[in-house]
């Protein structure tokens, strides 16, 4: 049975952790879905892991739409959520509605995710939710603000920062967000936010106290040349793929394939 937004809230109430991974194409989406992941996020991290951009900032809405369409074609079970890319929603709530509507209508995703909190993004979330667009929030380290943060630094380390992030999360829930990603913040802060909100929190580099956990699939599978300190590689596909390709090339050169 397909995972729904309502199911995520039920799982939070039951204390059942939520698994989330990123996807950017049909083959990976199919495999991850068949393996039983709860949520697939078509994350703007695909800018780096699939398209070779240095940050998420160059990714366009058209590129995101292309990848979201590929992902939804491979999914039968997981809830598919898609990031709104940089500058596709910050200008106005109306711009955000057009961008989100494109992804829901043309790619078939169930919801969108946007970065930031109070006050502007909370207003945008409210605007979208009022018009039937389910929205996931994202606070803490928001990668689209990488230059403003002077890198991918941990957020919420001071009392002032921690209170700001907490208030942003509260505002996003009040605006109608159905869940919130908490990225690269201290574990006690993430736990406090999780206990304060009635909607699910999904952590990445935020400790074990969240309602669920998300990893970039390329990091989880050992495909990334570099991965953040809070990621965990469950295998080393980079090594496996390199070895397989080298073996194929060697077989061809020595007339071992085909036989």
Curated annotation (Swiss-Prot):
Gene Ontology BP terms: pantothenate biosynthetic process
Protein name, entry field: 3-methyl-2-oxobutanoate hydroxymethyltransferase
Repeat keyword on record: no
GO cellular component: cytoplasm
Cofactor field: Mg(2+)
Compartments where located: Cytoplasm
Pathway stated in the Swiss-Prot or TrEMBL entry: Cofactor biosynthesis; (R)-pantothenate biosynthesis; (R)-pantoate from 3-methyl-2-oxobutanoate: step 1/2
